[in-house]
């Protein structure tokens, strides 16, 4: 597994010793100097965690989902003003991509937190959550689109609105379950990689608690912590 150069450039730029009041060094027209700055120790933590967790996540992936592409790529999302966040997606070839925002890297206090977050995102891929979410979205779109057709008598605007609403509801229907599933498997991945998932899950206490919102995308922090504790006790 190779860490993309974009990660190296982003992290090195982020921990630059240049004071904010000074003009940043020239880094080329296609590279933006991030507004969020992280320390040298945090940069080192990221590299250690990525190099430690990725092989374990890949092994889990090959064991549980051998038909998937298990070659994880780790990148940094340099979107200006992006809040602390991490997410899993796929590139055009189906390769799994785990992205961290610089704000999250600055917020994480130790390697255990970084390891748990990365393991959680890897678990989303291993468990096939993107495909399952898309399937739910299609089902919701077909259902509400069909109802809109019947109720409106075939109005294109009504059908389009029904399809869009149905897709959104369908995608969110099981999203909380997906997050808890990823927490459970992420706990196992982080622990196998040598990290403390309970310590890593302390990150939950420093982010807003979504509570139990109807059609919310994430479960309450208490439910997530309980899942981590339950799985950790089984290890």
Where does each model-flagged region fall?
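Post-HEXXH active-site segment of zinc metalloproteases
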Residues: 130-160
